[in-house]
């Protein structure tokens, strides 16, 4: 009798994905973030489901329903803060996953990479919708400012914004639809994750050398299932430390004030994981130009395969490109810091310089470094 996991139609899919999957023997801990993202997604769906049972998507009761969850529901405070800080962990893993893909040239697997970028946009949209739901000051004004950006679209902009709002301002209709979309989006993300994995398993994983590893592969289980447990334990430790000791560390104090359309907070800003894109948006004085730059800050990842000028896939053996990569990381940290600062001197000029450097590294410096390294290798 054949093994059930190799003969049963459903078990076969699981077997080919998590058990007998041929995996390069040289992949490092940087390849752990895919499975960690899966765990984060599962955690967000479960905690979100329990929060949705007690949440009210009406403007008059939304804020008090979140307070009710934290005060009266059994372990409601834990579920709420696991969900909020789980989103932060999700984005930390996401940024590290993209960083690893950029460093090791995983963007050459174009279908997997493009679905991944679609996943980034979906995750960012979901996080934005979720940030509006507690209906605090920053929720309301964040929703107003970010949705208002669509009015920069020529001709249809204003109509589009009013259509999204369901009226002439962010109100009850907006909150109801944002809650509905926030609920459905994680399931769309889960479907996209399956497509992402499907394309990945068509080509096989990349590895730190960037070379073909068909001659040296090992089964995923038990080697990488055991290895992934370490990442899982670290993720749980960081998430629980955040949730139990400093649950509001990454949040905004303004969100503990109920939404008030008549009182604008002194500094409107999104969650920390959007600050780099927000800084790029603010660094351009023109509204439409800022919106285009905001979208391009993520969309630029799509053209990375076209900007790849080196015969080597990974940056492991490319010192100039490595320097540029770490300058890019420092630049992103600078942009994140600038996004959280008020719009005044010297933050404006620092943000503009960091934004120019961000696009220059991708579009000009990285391709030039690849060409230079080619010439040095041929000498």
From Swiss-Prot:
A Pfam family this chain is assigned to: Cytochrom_B_C
Annotated TM spans: 33-53, 77-98, 113-133, 178-198, 226-246, 288-308, 320-340, 347-367
Sorted UniProt keywords: Electron transport, Heme, Iron, Membrane, Metal-binding, Mitochondrion, Mitochondrion inner membrane, Respiratory chain, Transmembrane, Transmembrane helix, Transport, Ubiquinone
A molecular function GO annotation: ubiquinol-cytochrome-c reductase activity
Recorded superkingdom: Eukaryota
Subunit composition and interactions: The cytochrome bc1 complex contains 11 subunits: 3 respiratory subunits (MT-CYB, CYC1 and UQCRFS1), 2 core proteins (UQCRC1 and UQCRC2) and 6 low-molecular weight proteins (UQCRH/QCR6, UQCRB/QCR7, UQCRQ/QCR8, UQCR10/QCR9, UQCR11/QCR10 and a cleavage product of UQCRFS1). This cytochrome bc1 complex then forms a dimer.
Tagged with keyword Heme: yes
Protein name, UniProt field: Cytochrome b
Binding-site list for a ubiquinone: 201
Cofactor section: heme b
Cofactor note: Binds 2 heme b groups non-covalently.
Binding site for heme b b566: 97, 196
Subcellular location: Mitochondrion inner membrane
Protein family: Belongs to the cytochrome b family.
Organism: Tachyoryctes splendens (East African mole rat)
Binding site for heme b b562: 83, 182
GO cellular component entries: mitochondrial inner membrane; respiratory chain complex III
